[in-house]
Curated annotation (Swiss-Prot):
Listed InterPro entries: Aldolase_TIM, Indole-3-glycerol_P_synth, Indole-3-glycerol_P_synth_dom, Indole-3-GlycerolPSynthase_CS, RibuloseP-bd_barrel
Name of the protein: Indole-3-glycerol phosphate synthase
UniProt keywords, alphabetically: Amino-acid biosynthesis, Aromatic amino acid biosynthesis, Decarboxylase, Lyase, Tryptophan biosynthesis
Pfam families in alphabetical order: IGPS (PF00218)
Alphabetized GO MF terms: indole-3-glycerol-phosphate synthase activity; phosphoribosylanthranilate isomerase activity
EC top class named in words: lyase
Enzyme Commission code: 4.1.1.48
PROSITE patterns: IGPS
Pathway linked to the protein: Amino-acid biosynthesis; L-tryptophan biosynthesis; L-tryptophan from chorismate: step 4/5
Family to which this protein belongs: Belongs to the TrpC family.
Catalyzed reactions: 1-(2-carboxyphenylamino)-1-deoxy-D-ribulose 5-phosphate + H(+) = (1S,2R)-1-C-(indol-3-yl)glycerol 3-phosphate + CO2 + H2O
Highest taxon listed in the record's lineage: Bacteria
GO biological process, one term: L-tryptophan biosynthetic process
Source species of the chain: Streptomyces griseus subsp. griseus (strain JCM 4626 / CBS 651.72 / NBRC 13350 / KCC S-0626 / ISP 5235)
Amino acid sequence: MSVLDEIIDGVRADLAERQARVSLDELKERAARAPQAKDGVAALRGEGVTVICEVKRSSPSKGALAAIADPAALAADYEAGGASVISVLTEERRFGGSLADLEAVRAKVDIPILRKDFIVTSYQLWEARAYGADLALLIVAALDQEALVSLIERAESIGLTPLVEAHDEEEAERAVDAGAKIIGVNARNLKDLKVDRSTFERVAPEIPDHIVKVAESGVRGPHDLIAYANAGADAVLVGESLVTGRDPRAAVADLVAAGAHPALRHGRG
């Protein structure tokens, strides 16, 4: 069994517990009261290369990363540094996240928020909207094509922008065929958790220009952002290096400045 399979087994068990406590109708009522969802595509189509900053306590590959007692304060630092989108991990077992983190961040920041989790049912999409998310992660490797198409359509119908994650050319093609408007290429292999930064360079050419291309994993600083930008990235997602660093606001500002450099924009055409 792969790491991804193990994570999803845990996600399904935790999901069953939440479904027993909170009905879908209750979630829909809460979602109806939530602020109107912000446009994730527009947020990531900014000048130069935009930055998604992640609230992330731990990971399967590294274990505990940071305590993050106040996720909202961290998100506010990200926003102050110039982040375009905040990513909030809500998976509990491997990443130490929660829907409470998502709710707290929503109350603090004005920019769009991505619910980052292992979404396998429409119930989780309703959770995302109910707790204030504007975007939701859908992982191609976790879904068959019928489910992927269905979840993209459901997400968009309730105001969410799907960020569809691929790990190779075949998955990117599936994401394009399913109608994704944002595709994230994750350099981390979910089978063995190793990072290969050349993954984006291989996969990006398979993604049409009208789709926002996000480089995920392996961004340690501006030099990695620039490398991804030169390979065609419209945005990067950064987590570990921010939560383990001393000054997340300054680190984000450095990334944003690199992404906005005129020479970089010119180089990307």
